[in-house]
From Swiss-Prot:
The name this protein goes by in its record: Short-chain dehydrogenase TIC 32, chloroplastic
Active site feature: 193
Residues that coordinate or bind NADP(+): 37-43, 89-90, 116, 137
The encoding gene: TIC32
GO biological process entries: protein transport
Matches recorded under Gene3D superfamilies: NAD(P)-binding Rossmann-like Domain
Leading EC class: oxidoreductase
Organism this protein belongs to: Pisum sativum (Garden pea)
Residues holding substrate: 171
Summary of subunit composition and partner proteins: Part of the Tic complex. Interacts with TIC110 (via N-terminus) and with calmodulin in a calcium-dependent manner. Interacts with TIC22 during import into chloroplast.
Function: Involved in protein precursor import into chloroplasts. Part of the redox regulon consisting of TIC32, TIC 55 and TIC62. Has a NADPH-dependent dehydrogenase activity, but only after preincubation with lipids.
Phylogenetic placement of the source organism: Eukaryota, Viridiplantae, Streptophyta, Embryophyta, Tracheophyta
Subcellular location, record wording: Plastid, Chloroplast inner membrane
Record Pfam families: adh_short
Amino acid sequence: MWPFSSKKGVSGFSGSSTAEQVTHGIDATGLTAIVTGASSGIGAETTRVLALRGAHVIMGVRNMVAAKDVKDTILKDIPSAKVDAIELDLSSLDSVKKFASEFNSSGRPLNILINNAGIMACPFKLSKDNIELQFATNHIGHFLLTNLLLDTMKKTTRESKKEGRIVNVASEAHRFAYPEGIRFDKINDQSSYNNWRAYGQSKLANVLHANQLTKHLKEDGVNITANSLHPGTIVTNLFRHNSAVNGLINVIGKLVLKNVQQGAATTCYVALHPQVKGVSGEYFSDSNVYKTTPHGKDVDLAKKLWDFSINLVKQK
């Protein structure tokens, strides 16, 4: 767990800033956003605040019942909110394809894509597509989803003349990936699996994905940015696989952890704030640009991951 700072950075915000505070005065009316993992935690709060600012938010969720509860709660507080949900399981490539097909065929525009869903430090398990579950859910699912939605985002950007933004919710845990960064030849190696390093590997992949995506978007000459971020360590059901961590959180959590309102702040800042206009390929923490690791800025590693991911989704 990483304690956050209440000292304001150059953006004027800090780790104690909330999602409402970092978006104060911003009008997102007319924008459409997708938020994955929106049925709980920072995903639900991100959805609420984007809707509060006027955006039409599509929740990509595994649990449609939980999504309805989130939507009902938001509408109770914000009767004018525009919130919908489409079923999405990021660990299943078929589910990702189905979600993208349904959204793309709806004719809706897409201004903002927030790749937020994730699982943390779970025991070794393979996804339905025979990919290590954390890598499959946290990276590969979002990688495919982004690629499948990109044409719609490009069309929206051209027609609206508004900047599109892709936001990858990574983590400071990317600093604790395997020593080589991404173990391309051992993704599914159970014998050497470490649940925390595998989580770090998947979060490093989120950072590298945004960096390489930035390169492609600039080459295409489209007005879409891609950034990654650390939301801060908060109490969410990410910790459901680790009872020891849950116990520790109950004892000292309030001293070092953000609440959900603070945890969603950096996501909402990167997604909406005018200070971030034109900024791409950066890593943010506490609503400020933050330094990543040498692996996190490794252009060769980013390209290798991109090519590896393309080949992996093609095989499935």
